[in-house]
Structures are given as structure tokens and as C-alpha cells.
Swiss-Prot record:
Start and end residues of each stretch annotated as II: 22-97
Glycosylation sites: 23, 68, 93, 146, 156, 162
Protein's name in the database: Neurexophilin-1
Assigned protein family: Belongs to the neurexophilin family.
PANTHER family membership: NEUREXOPHILIN, NEUREXOPHILIN-1
UniProt GO molecular function: signaling receptor binding
Gene name of the encoded protein: NXPH1
């Protein structure tokens, strides 16, 4: 009765190891053959294994708990040892037969930072509701990346009233004076260079139920307007100036966006 287990590990390096684990009837010990030269190792392995162990012994299996044993005896001839150069030639030939994997084409990286949205429609909005007027103003600012930026506004209103939206420097005084709302001081003209680029106003009229008395019908005017300013540098900061006048309500408001939100250079207001 004998049992033999072999584990052969072949590493393609200057040193090749062959580990043999065998439990034999005569000694029951394991042999470990190791050599620094691959050529001498191969010769030593094949000659020793041909003397001590044959294929018939290697394939002989004994199953515990069974009476019958199966033995296979095959004719085995000692192979000719391969040199180290033969192994490297075989490795080179097998590598050449493998087709290289096609590389996936990568899309070129496209920089999308040319147009930088400084403020979106939701960042600035003004909603005014009175008995006779319902007003909503939204705006956004877009930096074009070439030293200029645009300011866009859209305004929807239902009812009667006078609405004015303009861009002013931070030094603009908030006051109920229509004549001075678009005046820019001479000292601010160098740092404030904006002009109207696009403007469109659509108006319509309809009769609806009055807000203050649903039993009555009121004449209402609906207005939708779009306006855009184109500003160029150098500039410090711009503010949005809104003035609203109606028969029962007046409002003047100046809003200066926080430019530290989008600019690497902090803005320190003066005045």
C-alpha cells in the first residue's frame, strides 16, 4: 500500500523549483529537490525520478474501505532534458502567437469651463404680490471667459404697475426717484462698463376675476419681458436695482450678489 502526491510548480525565472511530496513504503519521507541552475536541475530531476518513481506508481490509487485496487502500468521513456535557452525560445514563440488586444480609443478631454455660470435663475428672484399686481423677476449671470459677462433678466407680471430693472454700481443710492435710477457717477464709469445687448417685451390683456372681489371682473394686463446686458472688465461689482410703482404699492430695492461665491479673488465692498 502506498500513496503519492506530487505538486510541480514551474516558474519561468533563472531558478526552477520542483517540490515532490511522496509517502513511500520504504521510508515515508518527502524529497525536496532544489538547484540554482535550471539546466542542472532539469537533468537531476528527470534522472532521479526515472529511477525511483514511474508513471505506474504515480497513477496507482488505493481507495480506503474498498477491497479492489486499480493499478495502471504504462510504458514510460525518460524525456530529453531541455536547456534554459530552449525554454526561453518556447516562451518567446508562444508570446508571439498571441494577438495583442486592441486598445480602446479614448475620447479627447474637452474643457467645458469656457462658459461659467456665476449665478443661475434660482440664485436671484424677486416676487411681489399686491391686490392689483402679481410680479416675478428672475435673473442670472454668465461669465464668457473672455473678459466679458452677460446679465439676463426675465419678468412676468399680471396687473397694473410700473417696473424697472437696471444694473447699477454699489454706490447707487436707494431712493424713490425715477430720474436718478439709471444715472452712473463719473468715478464709477471706469469700473462699470455695461450696455443693453437684447431686449424684448410682450404684452397682452384679458378680463379675469378681481382679486379683491371675485364677484367682479377686472381688466388685467400681462407683460413678459426679457433683457440682457453685456458687461466687460475691468469691473469691481455690479448690483441689481429694482423699482416698482403702482397705485397702492411702491418698492425700491438694490441687490448686490456675493461675488466671493464664484470668484477666487475675494471682493471687499467699499462705500
Amino acid at each position: 500500500m502506498q500513496a503519492a502526491c506530487w505538486y510541480v510548480l514551474l516558474l519561468l525565472q533563472p531558478t526552477i523549483y520542483l517540490v515532490t511530496c511522496a509517502n513511500l513504503t520504504n521510508g515515508g519521507k518527502s524529497e525536496l529537490l532544489k538547484s540554482g541552475s535550471s539546466k542542472s536541475t532539469l537533468k537531476h530531476i528527470w534522472t532521479e525520478s526515472s529511477k525511483d518513481l514511474s508513471i505506474s506508481r504515480l497513477l496507482s490509487q488505493t481507495f480506503r474501505g474498498k477491497e479492489n485496487d486499480t493499478d495502471l502500468d504504462l510504458r514510460y521513456d525518460t524525456p530529453e532534458p531541455y536547456s534554459e535557452q530552449d525554454l526561453w525560445d518556447w516562451l518567446r514563440n508562444s508570446t508571439d502567437l498571441q494577438e495583442p488586444r486592441p486598445r480602446a480609443k479614448r475620447r479627447p478631454i474637452v474643457k467645458t469651463g469656457k462658459f461659467k455660470k456665476m449665478f443661475g435663475w434660482g440664485d436671484f428672484h424677486s416676487n411681489i404680490k399686491t391686490v392689483k399686481l402679481n410680479l416675478l423677476i428672475t435673473g442670472k449671470i454668465v461669465d464668457h471667459g473672455n473678459g466679458t459677462f452677460s446679465v439676463y433678466f426675465r419678468h412676468n407680471s399680471t396687473g397694473q404697475g410700473n417696473v424697472s430693472v437696471s444694473l447699477v454700481p454699489p454706490t447707487k443710492i436707494v431712493e424713490f426717484d425715477l430720474a436718478q435710477q439709471t444715472v452712473i457717477d463719473a468715478k464709477d464709469s471706469k469700473s462699470f462698463n455695461c450696455r443693453i445687448e437684447y431686449e424684448k417685451v410682450d404684452k397682452a390683456t384679458k378680463n379675469t376675476l378681481c382679486n379683491y372681489d371675485p364677484s367682479k371682473t377686472c381688466y388685467q394686463e400681462q407683460t413678459q419681458s426679457h433683457v440682457s446686458w453685456l458687461c466687460s472688465k475691468p469691473f469691481k461689482v455690479i448690483c441689481i436695482y429694482i423699482s416698482f410703482y403702482s397705485t397702492d404699492y411702491k418698492l425700491v430695492q438694490k441687490v448686490c450678489p456675493d461675488y466671493n461665491y464664484h470668484s477666487d479673488t475675494p471682493y471687499f465692498p467699499s462705500g
